[in-house]
From Swiss-Prot:
Its main location: membrane. Pfam families: p450 (PF00067). This is Cytochrome P450 monooxygenase adrA. Keywords: Glycoprotein, Heme, Iron, Membrane, Metal-binding, Monooxygenase, Oxidoreductase, Transmembrane, Transmembrane helix. Its EC number is 1.-.-.-. It is a single-pass membrane protein. Its cofactor is heme. It comes from Penicillium roqueforti.
Amino acid sequence: MAVDKLPLLAKLEPVSLIGLVLLSGLFFLLTATRKSDLPLVNGKRPFEFGIAKARQRYLKNAHSLITAGLEKAGAFRIVTENGTRTILSPKYADDIRSHRDLSLSAALVKEHHVNIAGFDAVKVTVTSDIIQDTVRTKLTQNLLNITEPMSEEATILLKAQWTDSTEWHDVALRPKTLGIVAQLSSRVFLGDKVCRNPDWLRLTVNYTIDSLMAAAELRLWPEMLRPIAAKFLPKCKKIRKQLEEARNIIQPVIDERRLAQQAAIKQGKPQERYHDAIQWLAENTKDRTFEPAAMQLALSTAAIHTTTDLLTQTILDLCGREELVQELREEIISVFKDGSWDKTTMYKLKLMDSVIKESQRVKPMAIAKMARCAEEDVKLSDGTIIPRGEIILVSCSKMWDANVYPDPNTFDPHRFLKLRQQGSDQESFAQLVSPSPEHMGFGFGKHACPGRFFAAAELKVALCHIIMKYDFKVAEGCNPQVLKSGMRLAADPFARIAIRRRQEEISF
């Protein structure tokens, strides 16, 4: 992505420009860190100037580069689109899972420009523990209260967007799954008054993508110049506008609730409690100041695209497996024989749990997780040194290790169900929400995805409705392929499926 920097530089006075250059040099000297001694797997080749070619090789062949690196060393460096990163073998996962000098927040600061206006949704996750506390406590504790509303929303959305047509018809899968996840998530985060607002749904979908593009745009600039560049760059201007639009949507809801609470207090009536994130954030912040719009965008950023990708991949993995789909229908019918969602429903959907976890094992969203930044020089248990300022990631290679998973490259929907049936020692490990070095779909350690319990519930609600209400198969002429870019893996964004309405045996 090329950015013309000359028009912006031309607006600076010569003296100011010289001052900025000198400040950049001083900043570099003051923050310079020791050089890593770890091998670099994709450095410059003979007659190459700069690292542009190395970045291209990374984007195209990251998986093979990391595999080759792990065969030679347990720790090595790799040139990525965001600079050089250190990749660690999964054997180090326990070393770093709670290491006090390895910081997720510091890694986010370096990657996402959190101190620049517009990136507020990332900033609130770094500078405050409100989001994490709300997800770990309020959201997880209220899963039973939010399951029925999500189910109601799924009924409304599927009827409108997937239709009741009993004739086979083709649809683009990812837009459909994105719509489901965005609306179900918004029902939980903002309640029923906002969750169907098309402007809010558009914002929640677009802000994540646009903020990532804005971050990439800024990385083309020296760090000292980025706050200035952000004032003029189109993507940065766009996310600032989106943040303001989010405020205009959310603030009236908050104001309306505040007035209703004041009226209830004045009349001596009990205040209405809401089972949504507006209520939970207010309860968790207490006397602390917070930005409601940024908090809501942060929740959406964390939830929507990751869950959408897993839902998309799971549906693609079910296509063409009619016997498996029938097994899932029978499990759903058995679990819902009394026709209600209760506290044991999600646990009882063990085959579905296994299917989702296996989809995530075969194709996670990234081939390395547990991003951390070393705030001091860190010495690992075997003496490996991670220099201060270095960003590290742990390879997910155990997810495809034949010593851990027999026939690891084969999708086995019953794999984790069979493990759970072996006994109590495997019960926890084999559940979708259980992270481990052998399955880092949700990360691992103290920063493992705190929203994984909600994601699992949301996925199961969506799949219950889709599986019971629709027949589906890959559309004729479509051959879904995993999209690979660097360490990222994405369910085919262009995949199309054929669907038709069926008569469900039970009602939710």
